[in-house]
């Protein structure tokens, strides 16, 4: 119990630090977004407006992540036997979905402007984009100091980094408009921004989806874990082996282990738990250890396709 208490205290300290970094980044993003919307309208720049729209999703992602971190920090109670730890996963799913929707809107408007390009104020675009690069660098630096293994933090980080790249593309587009008068550079830059959004969304949805579908954590092979359990000299049979992730950095395992008649089930269970924690980093285990019937062959069985990539 002491180890779990220390672990919970460390999580509380880390969570508070993460919330502070997120709050600072949120303040920067909201302040600059308000300025950028005004400049985008005056300059008639879709690239700037798409950046501002992306910053709106950044702000939403940061706010959602703050709420998710607060909820995830709540202790288990009542029917919520694991607490609300998966709030961070739902936050990542929402962030990924928002990126997909926004990318679609931007591409639609960009195509319309490619067909009939309006005039663009190149100077306003370049200056605002350079300021946006500076703001996003600071916000990225803040979030880089937070715990990016947390899916809520990682979702916000991906939003900010994508926005940083978008501002770089917008600055280049503005410079092209200034030098060549090629107004279509602005919507073309917007399509590039949308592509970055979709790439970031794919990563978020895939990682968070694996957790929601209770796939084995990345880097852990179920067959290897089952083999490690079966290697124990007193183990006769391993089945119903399941490995999943309750939340980011919270792997769990359950299995039914049969040992030879006369062996100490409790001692073997403790040895297996220690091995799983030291070798695979799994400290939340539920092992049912019983005696095997005579002459039962060694086998490892689990849910089909447990190692299939998601």
Task: List each model region and its residues.
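First transmembrane helix
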Residues: 22-38, 135-138
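Short, hydrophobic transmembrane alpha-helix segments
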Residues: 37-49
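Residue-level recognition of phosphate/Mg2+-coordinating polar/acidic sites
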Residues: 57
């Amino acid at each position: 119990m002491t180890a779990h208490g220390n672990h919970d205290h460390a999580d509380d300290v880390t969570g508070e630090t993460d919330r502070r970094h997120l709050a600072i980044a949120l303040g920067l993003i909201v302040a600059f977004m308000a300025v950028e919307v005004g400049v985008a309208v005056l300059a008639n720049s879709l690239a700037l407006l798409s950046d501002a729209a992306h910053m709106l999703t950044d702000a939403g992602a940061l706010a959602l992540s703050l709420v998710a971190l607060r909820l995830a920090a709540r202790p288990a109670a009542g029917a919520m036997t694991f607490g609300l730890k998966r709030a961070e996963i739902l936050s990542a799913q929402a962030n990924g979905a928002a990126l997909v929707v926004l990318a679609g809107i931007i591409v639609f408007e960009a195509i319309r402007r490619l067909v009939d390009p309006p005039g663009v104020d190149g100077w306003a675009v370049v200056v605002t984009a350079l300021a946006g690069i500076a703001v996003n660098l600071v916000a990225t630096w803040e979030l880089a100091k937070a715990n990016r293994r947390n899916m809520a933090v990682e979702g916000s980080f991906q939003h900010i980094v994508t926005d940083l790249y978008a501002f770089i593309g917008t600055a280049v587009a503005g410079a092209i408009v200034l030098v060549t008068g090629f107004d279509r550079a602005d919507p073309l830059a917007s399509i590039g921004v949308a592509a970055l959004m979709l790439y970031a969304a794919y990563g978020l949805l895939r990682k968070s989806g694996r957790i929601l579908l209770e796939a084995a954590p990345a880097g852990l092979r179920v067959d290897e874990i089952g083999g490690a359990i079966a290697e124990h000299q007193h183990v006769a049979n391993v089945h119903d082996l399941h490995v999943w992730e309750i939340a980011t950095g919270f792997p769990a395992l359950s299995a039914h282990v049969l040992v030879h008649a006369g062996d100490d089930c409790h001692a073997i269970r403790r040895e297996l738990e220690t091995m799983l924690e030291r070798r695979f980093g799994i400290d939340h285990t539920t092992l049912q250890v019983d005696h095997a019937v005579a002459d039962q062959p060694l086998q490892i069985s689990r849910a089909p396709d447990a190692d299939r990539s998601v």
